[in-house]
Amino acid sequence: MSLSPEGPRPAPSAGGLRVAAIGDLHVGETHRRPYRELFARISQEADVLALCGDLTNFGKTPEAEILAEDLQACAIPVVGVLGNHDYECGQPQEVARILHEAGLKLLDGEAFEIEGVGFAGCKGFIGGFGRHMLSAFGEPEIKQFVQAAVEENLKLETGLRMLRNERIVVVTHYSPVLDTLQGEPPEIYPFLGSARMGETIDRFEGVKIAFHGHAHRGAYEGRTSRGVPVYNVARPVLNRDVGIEFALFDV
């Protein structure tokens, strides 16, 4: 069930964990405490915060440090993944280190359990969907491209295999389904996600919900082939299409 953070907080479902999710923060060097108040408010509404990549604008150290300062306002566990913007300056490991020291549990082939709910994820990669998914055929460059998508998907699978929970949340940056890309130009669908991740999600019955970002002009809600709910929580989608600052779900 999706809950607007603007209304009064309902009682959580029995044994449920309230998860807030948001992606595409795009923190820049000139920003000053851009999310401190929001993180403090999320801490009052949710039990866990999931960040779905593009946490910084260009993957610069000062940007990560600004976000790290704001994360100190979070009084709840924070899990998340990096996005393509966090790789732009060629130092994603440094961005990850800064955010890890600020308390972010990075999902990059790892898995975490919080109050009985499992969390797994990865950045993900591109490649397309269905019959139009790119295959490893032809030039070496194409094969390298596809291999990058395969390796990212293996990180997700590795994390999921670590979990034995009946309730699992998947967090990625790129989309695992085509549904949540509706609204984007069809020509760029292959560059917004990969069906490989959706197929992996469907192999693990414990997965109850998945969050991603990246598709700023996409749709809010979709499903995998097995029916697992998938939500595009990129900030522009939440603000424009749903009228909320963060998604909030009982899992």
Q: Which residues are covered by each model-predicted region?
A:
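Active-site neighborhood of phospho(di)ester-bond hydrolases with catalytic His/Asp-centered motifs
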Residues: 21-23, 49-54, 78-84, 105-109, ...
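Hydrophobic alpha-helical segments and helix pairs
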Residues: 89, 95-127
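Binuclear metal-dependent phosphoesterase catalytic core
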Residues: 2-9, 13-16, 113, 195-208, ...
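Active-site-proximal segments of metal-dependent phosphoesterases and phosphodiesterases across multiple
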Residues: 67, 134-140, 163-206
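Active-site-proximal beta-strand elements of phosphoester/diester hydrolases
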Residues: 16-26, 116-128, 169-173, 229-235
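N-terminal active-site segment of His-dependent metallophosphoesterases
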Residues: 1-77, 87-90, 142, 146, ...
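Metal-dependent catalytic neighborhoods of phosphoester/phosphodiester hydrolases
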Residues: 31-35, 55-72, 82, 87-102, ...
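Binuclear metal-dependent hydrolase catalytic cores centered on His/Asp/Glu-rich metal-binding motifs
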Residues: 117-165, 190-195
